[in-house]
Amino acid sequence: MQVEETLLKKKQTINANNILSFNRVAVAPYSYIALTPYGQKI
């Protein structure tokens, strides 16, 4: 029972990390564009 709980917690942590890294990858191009002079003109 305890082993299953530990695996479940690990799985949830991995899922959370995947979501965070996905958000970083998805947002990175936009924040990069915003930091460039070209992005500031828009």
UniProtKB/Swiss-Prot annotation:
It is found in: Plastid, Chloroplast. GO terms for cellular component: chloroplast. Keywords: Chloroplast, Plastid. This is Uncharacterized 4.8 kDa protein in secA 3'region. It comes from Diacronema lutheri.
